Amino acid sequence: MDIIFVRHGVPDFSLADERCMTQLEKDYAPLDRAYLSELHQKLTNAVFDDAQAIICSPYTRALQTAEILNRRHGFELFVEHDLREWRADTAGGYISLAERDRRWHEYRELLKLRLPMSDERYEHVTALKARTMAVLERYRQYDKVIVVSHFNVFEALQGYQEQGLACGDFKIFRL
């Protein structure tokens, strides 16, 4: 199965951060309107034309990106809970942006070095990859799908990425 992996557009977390919302509440943040034109342009690429379905994270930023893409194509759209973001706090409470970033950098450094992850406060790459693969296996009947999700989901599938994947960008790979 060919996968066109699209990282969601640029989110606007300003209100969520201003109100010290929990991670769950932050996931309702919409896309930043200042970047919508750029996202629309990126999603007009002909590579999407022969896909058969869109499989999407349930987070608002991914859903809004998938909706923009789907407006052009009218593909069947599947929303999958397990394509969600990496969990910075497995307990599900509020953690500061600084602490979330610290955990993210630690997570990525361990991923880069291929070292075991032992901090139980955040989700490990093996768990993230397992839940993502379980979702994708259900869509094997398709030859080509678009997955709209998050950078850490892409990295769980493709390994550590030195250059990252900018919001709204996409990569194609075979599963």
Where are these regions (language model features)?
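Acidic, low-complexity terminal tails and accessory targeting/binding regions
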Residues: 1-3, 19, 37-47, 78, ...
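Active-site-proximal alpha-helix that buttresses catalytic centers in soluble enzyme cores
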Residues: 2-77
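Generic beta-sheet signal
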Residues: 3, 52, 141-151
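Cofactor-binding loop segments of dinucleotide-utilizing enzymes, especially the Rossmann-like FAD-
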Residues: 8, 82, 150
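Short, active-site-adjacent cap segments at secondary-structure transitions
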Residues: 12, 62-63, 85-86, 153-155
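Phosphate-handling substructures
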Residues: 15-33, 72-130
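Active-site catalytic microenvironments for nucleophilic, acid-base chemistry
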Residues: 68-72, 138, 160-163
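A short, acidic, amphipathic alpha-helical segment used as a generic capping/interface helix at domain edges
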Residues: 127-141
